[in-house]
């Protein structure tokens, strides 16, 4: 069983590294990250310190999209190719199949993130390299969380075009509209919602939690207070729990959905 699961992981990794859309988006990410590093290298010392926050903004936009694109066809793609039944007939459980596909794609995503940040790191000024290296693990957490969401979308959708539409919609929702919705909530309630509630809702979104953690990294624990937001940040244990939930729950739910679908037939 372990040998079959390992073969599935390797197969997914090789297939995704040959996916032209993933390659294109990864190259775009690497190019944009390199452009940020080039700007930091050519700018004065004061402007060079903006390279890290600029890279965080870029990552919070591009990496979730790459991850959702990478995960959106994990299950539904097999269904449309009529190979899902063959895949589920292997001597591994439904959950193990989903986890193997998820892990293989997570490795491919790690390669894409590594290439993008590696390109930026290679041409970054020496003073900014430590900061950029500190972005690697949080960026991988962000990407894997959205990859998990993409895998769940793939298990729910019945057609690949539907899964792609859902993935793009979720990207807009998590990256753009979520924060706008919270801002609208503050406006509608005339500030009646407490800052603690808003902070909790922001950190419940993986993209928002990533931005908050990176703001703390660059500005220190008092960074939000300096912006007039005197709210308690989630503890390290709570942040780890939020990340673990976003990363682990969607693939598990996907495996359960496959098991339920198989049982109905």
Name each model-derived stretch:
Residues 26, 101-102, 135, 139, ...:
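Residue-level recognition of transmembrane alpha-helices
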Residues 64-71, 148-149, 178, 206, ...:
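Hydrophobic/aromatic residues in alpha-helical transmembrane segments
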């Amino acid at each position: 069983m372990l040998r079959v699961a390992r073969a599935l992981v390797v197969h997914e990794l090789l297939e995704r590294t040959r996916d032209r859309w993933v390659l294109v988006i990864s190259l775009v990410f690497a190019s944009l990250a390199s452009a940020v590093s080039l700007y930091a290298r050519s700018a004065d010392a004061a402007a060079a310190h903006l390279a890290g926050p600029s890279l965080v903004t870029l990552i919070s936009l591009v990496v979730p999209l790459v991850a959702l694109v990478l995960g959106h066809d994990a299950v539904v793609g097999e269904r449309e190719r009529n190979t899902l039944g063959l895949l589920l007939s292997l001597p591994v459980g439904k959950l193990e199949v989903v986890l193997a596909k998820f892990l293989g794609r997570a490795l491919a995503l790690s390669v894409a993130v590594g290439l993008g940040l590696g390109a930026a790191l290679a041409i970054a000024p020496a003073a900014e390299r430590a900061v950029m290296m500190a972005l690697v693990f949080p960026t991988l957490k962000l990407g894997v969380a959205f990859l998990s969401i993409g895998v769940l979308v793939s298990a729910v959708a019945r057609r690949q075009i539907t899964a792609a539409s859902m993935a793009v919609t979720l990207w807009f929702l998590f990256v753009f509209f979520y924060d706008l919705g919270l801002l609208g909530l503050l406006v509608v309630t005339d500030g009646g919602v407490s800052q603690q509630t808003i902070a909790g809702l922001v950190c419940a979104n993986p993209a928002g939690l990533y931005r908050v953690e990176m703001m703390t990294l660059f500005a220190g624990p008092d960074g939000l207070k300096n912006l007039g937001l005197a709210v308690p940040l989630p503890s390290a244990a709570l942040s780890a729990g939020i990340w673990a939930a976003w990363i682990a729950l969607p693939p598990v739910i996907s495996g359960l959905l496959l098991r339920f679908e198989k049982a109905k037939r």
